[in-house]
Amino acid sequence: MQKKIFLLEDDYLLSESVKEFLEHLGYEVFCAFNGKEAYERLSVERFNLLLLDVQVPEMNSLELFKRIKNDFLISTPVIFITALQDNATLKNAFNLGASDYLKKPFDLDELEARIKRFFNDDPIEIMPNIFYHQNCLSVRGKKEILPPKTAQLLEYFLEHKGQIISSQALENNLWEQAIDDSTLRTYIKVLRKLLGKNCIETHKGVGYRFNPL
């Protein structure tokens, strides 16, 4: 089935270039040029991936993403595109549940690689002899079906491997509400038991980093 990608970009030439490139790769691409237009389209149609330029007219993409999550319970992966050299903006994006980001100017081959991470149907090798595929963890040949929240947590860590992720970002992405710290620690403990205690680092007062050896 053809994957559908939604692109929000107010630079018409860049939008057309990205659209043409992605269509050549076999994706179905829909474009919007401002936040209001994007909101209206996303209110009636679902996509497999969102590419959102942060600074667009009428409603910036951070506000757009927050609204579509709250109004339509959309959990589609989103890659933010930004020309801003502003770590606070990126932090806000990840706190909202962003899956990834690209900084302008970006290479189209890099964009392709980022997108394929979300559409790859092959098992992901987490570390030697440990694979993950569609809620199933294979550890040295032994298969373990992960509960939905545990699987979502692992997938979020895989998307942000090597990055420090705040507890708030994990809460927003997986529960979309405040939870007890003990709840998150329980899920972390389950993954550590399956993958090894050193695969998830705790950065006290900051968050966690998934760093499998």
From Swiss-Prot:
Name of protein: Transcriptional regulatory protein CrdR
PTM field: Phosphorylated by CrdS.
Signal peptide location: none
Disulfides per UniProt: none
Gene Ontology CC annotations of this record: cytosol; protein-DNA complex
Name of the gene encoding the protein in the UniProt record: crdR
InterPro entries reported for this sequence: CheY-like_superfamily (IPR011006), OmpR/PhoB-type_DNA-bd (IPR001867), Sig_transdc_resp-reg_C-effctor (IPR016032), Sig_transdc_resp-reg_receiver (IPR001789), WalR-like (IPR039420), WH-like_DNA-bd_sf (IPR036388)
Alphabetical UniProt keywords: DNA-binding, Phosphoprotein, Transcription, Transcription regulation, Two-component regulatory system
Source species of the chain: Helicobacter pylori (strain ATCC 700392 / 26695)
Claim: Lipoprotein is one of the keywords in the record: no
PANTHER family listed in its UniProt record: DNA-BINDING DUAL MASTER TRANSCRIPTIONAL REGULATOR RPAA, REGULATOR OF RPOS
Any one GO molecular function term: phosphorelay response regulator activity
Description of the deletion phenotype: Deletion mutant is not able to colonize the stomach in mice. Also shows a significant loss of viability upon exposure to nitric oxide.
Protein task: Member of the two-component regulatory system CrdR/CrdS that induces the transcriptional induction of the copper resistance determinant CrdA. Upon phosphorylation by CrdS, functions as a transcriptional regulator by direct binding to promoter regions of target genes including the crdA promoter or nitric oxide-responsive gene promoters.
DNA-binding region per Swiss-Prot/TrEMBL record: 121-212
